[in-house]
Amino acid sequence: LDQASTILSLDCDFIGGEADAHRHIRDFAKGRKLNNGRTDMSRLYVVEPRMTQTGANADHRLRVKAGFVHGVASAIARGLGIKGLEAQPLPESVKDGWMDQCVDDLKKGGVVMAGHGQPEEVHVLAHAINQKIGAIGSGVQFLPAPNSGYGTIKDLAEASFDVLLILGGNPAYSAPADIDWKKLIDGKKVVRLGYYDDESAVDADLFLAQTHFLEEWGDARTSDGTTVAVRPLIKPLFDGLSELEVLAHIAGVAKT
């Protein structure tokens, strides 16, 4: 954001309620300062249904219902020359002058951000606009997505297994209605790691008490791809196990 001359927020409260707000605030503030040879501040356009911290800092704010954000994004995309888009409904309150000025500023370079509450269509348009204005690779960086190649509970129902290890969750309660959980685990050895004596714990042959996340070591990945260590805040109150410890024991690692 500190490099963008124009920022368009499509119902994205990046200063307040969105993820990584602390980083976005810092970068946005840098773009608003006239120093280090910079003579122009970044310009912020915000399209949103309610007042947010981002909207309060906007140079140009357009208030529309959440369902009309798609229409505004589509109109801006078509104004930038993106082909193959159909006109979407817009409220009468949207003025052509606002849209034209936003399009003109985006042509000079910028970045578009879509909020997590907006549908897939709005995010696709945001990516298309970023591609059109040359933001990909500069203001927008893509990172490898986390491994999503895990199976589903329906895959489990169709699989052949003897031992089922449940790490957290409560599938006995939350499994889809078309999955007969009792039948699925019939004759199987079920081991459950969890916090509570819930429905899945009742069905388990062996229940392992799980440590609270504030009691365990771990690792995580930030939004910019940085791997970080997670330290416990307190010593375990009880003699529980974390998910990593259980998996380590299964893998034959004596000490974690």
Language-model segments: what does each one mean?
Residues L1-T256:
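Non-catalytic alpha/beta scaffold blocks inside enzyme catalytic domains
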